[in-house]
């Protein structure tokens, strides 16, 4: 289904009386609204910028409470955040971060009263903010997630069930059924989609493979990846690691991972192997249907910096890319 067909379909079902959807922002976070201390250091050195990074506003804290591991906002990103806070009717973070990682954002800075939904884990989960339990996010000094913190977020159960159990069809949820059709249309060439169901993929399979590669090429690539043994793969739905060199990923590796049901995401030294059905654009499409958001009548802005952001940005009225983005290199 191309974008023109999607938009035409949206026009038919749009409720012009909607008071909720006026200006909506779907935004990636890392490298879009803030950047890591390390990446800023490299950029500032390359561009002759003498700003002390530690004086810039903190966008997100790290789990080890190390200042040099925090993420910060340059002035132009801070102005974008201020605009979103002040002008958007709805701000929906669309991130590869887990919910726990999302909760390390500096919410004293990101004081979003228009934050009602969060897309995490690259589209696997959609969370609803429960405003009755207090403010979103943990404090700077105490970021341990309490039971009250956990109650701040309510998972969209229908979406989570589709991601976790693999069933496409839900006759009681027309938005979900429509999204399932959209996913199938977008994924015609993918062997994982058949008989109106997702293939239920066991991500542990990749862990078993990683020490027993079938060829020298695969072994030479994967031996340069450091996997996190403590990562909750079943929860996140994807496998995260770091590469020790900057070599281009051979096409044979992409093909091999495709056969296993994964696509490869890479940003600088970070690499992730993500199931093909776990994509930001699918979650964005579902929310747009559920909330009656229309990219023709409403102002829908998509912000992102990486290849995995492009497709959800294409569902929006405008796509915005920050400077120093991978998409501009």
List the predicted regions and their residue ranges.
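Short glycine-/acidic-enriched loop or helix-start segments at secondary-structure transitions
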Residues: 36-37, 43, 102-105, 129-130, ...
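Active-site phosphate-binding/coordination module
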Residues: 70-218
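Active-site neighborhood of HAD-like aspartate-dependent phosphohydrolases
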Residues: 6-11, 15-93
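Conserved acidic, metal-coordinating active-site core of Asp-based
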Residues: 195-301, 306-315
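Short, well-ordered alpha-helix to beta-strand connector turns
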Residues: 22, 88, 115, 122, ...
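Short, well-ordered beta-strand core segments
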Residues: 91, 118, 300, 319-320
